[in-house]
Regions:
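Boundary/entry segment of secreted carbohydrate-active catalytic domains
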Residues: 1-20
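Short, acidic/polar
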Residues: 17-30
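Enzymes and membrane/adaptor proteins characterized by extended Gly/Ser/Thr/Asp/Glu-rich
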Residues: 28-103
């Protein structure tokens, strides 16, 4: 693959439907060097499922020659936007932390 495509891919965050990595997201990580994956409610079920999903994606990136691990993000703002709910630790919304004025 052309180096320019891999460099572009390193700046891309990809998402996907379902609780298993889709063929498209695997191709983007493997063939185009996508360096970041974001998870939404549609991707998460239980801690064990998410851990296995992340392990699979990290192994795919490693096997594809990524120099660094994937950055895996979750759309988790706290409050109403909380993709990881119990049994995960639930944090207050960031605006509540901001109101403390200690930042």
């Amino acid at each position: 693959m052309r180096e320019s495509l891999r460099k572009a891919g390193q700046r891309v965050t990809v998402g996907f439907d379902g609780q298993a990595a889709s063929a498209d997201v695997k191709r983007l990580v493997r063939d185009y060097g996508a360096a970041s994956v974001i998870l939404f409610a549609r991707n998460v079920d239980a801690p064990e499922q998410v851990a296995e999903l992340v392990r699979e994606l990290q192994a795919l990136a490693r096997d594809a020659g990524h120099e660094l691990p994937l950055l895996v993000a979750v759309d988790q703002e706290g409050g109403r936007v909380a993709r990881l709910r119990a049994p995960w630790t639930e944090w207050p919304p960031l605006r509540a932390l901001g109101r403390l004025g200690s930042a």
